[in-house]
């Protein structure tokens, strides 16, 4: 259909207003999308709002996108003046349709800096843009800028430090932002396979908003277990778990624990106790065992997926490095045998009975009953974990090759064995 320039302007202005009104009517919109519709069949708005879903009929995009794009460029070139409210509406519409338009994000940065927008509102727009374009690099880059600004806003000043209520509110604000960011990353990863941008952003969030937070690291390792089990070819998801294991190993290292002991919380309490040391020695062997067991289950259930073998290789290498550093850390001090040492040496023992293993466990740790944590107790209820080792990995490979009918699975198993012999076996 042929429209005059004036008619197009009126149409587009109405559509922009309809989008703005849709967000006012329902501030809980959580997804946007295009509705395939080659031409306008009815005399009605092309903006469709159903529950928390916002749809835009595709016929209007060819008019809408060039209009808002040109409007914003004219503003940046100082050829046309737009008030702040109009800028918010135009940039919102433009970024929902094309989130990789850097100029629009830069305009919103200026609006944030002058106080027209708040960080949470801008993060919400980015979340909606990612529901349609989950890999948009400009959106992820902008989110990091906004999160850094949010952190600065929540950093307590001298006066706020005296106001415990205000300090607590800012802390809760950051905590909500952290939880929301993890949800956004998970949703984007589910919408686009091997979404490197989403997983990289998730790592950035951990490094900048949850640095040294063991609870967040443990929760992330637990929450992504099911996800990777359902996406066995997603390299980025498994790489994220590798990052979590490395971060946990670093935070639970003796050097890190020493730093933790000397640090204090704002309330003056130490962040770690002596009982934590005993517990931390057992955490990493258990986590490595669980990760290797996860790899075993997935490799046997989904043969022929190279991602799983690559992940197993990386996890075993991390375990090998951690074990070597742990042994070197003991040095010549000849420390007393601990539960961890039993776990490390279990692979060298014959197949003793479960009751015998549990008796050894009780003897070794009988003097530490008062310092058990809940995780330690859970670990003690079963037999000692068989930790991954060079012999156990060769046994696993032999079992795979013996019963394997998938040529790709055999090729990956043989390659893994060569890697073990050439890298670990040296």
Curated annotation (Swiss-Prot):
Is the keyword ATP-binding assigned to this protein? no
Q: Which InterPro entries match?
A: Prenyl_trans_a
User: Which residue intervals are annotated with compositional bias (Polar residues) in the record?
Assistant: 262-275
Keyword vocabulary terms for this entry: Prenyltransferase, Repeat, Transferase
One MF term in GO for this entry? Answer: protein prenyltransferase activity
Q: Which GO CC annotations does the UniProt entry carry?
A: cytoplasm
Identify the domain of life. Eukaryota
Each PFTA repeat, start to end: 86-119, 121-154, 180-213, 219-252, 290-323
Name the residues that span the membrane: none
Which portions of the sequence form the region Disordered? 255-279
Q: Name the protein family.
A: Belongs to the protein prenyltransferase subunit alpha family.
**What's the protein here called?**
Protein prenyltransferase alpha subunit repeat-containing protein 1
Source species of the chain: Danio rerio
What gene codes for this chain? ptar1
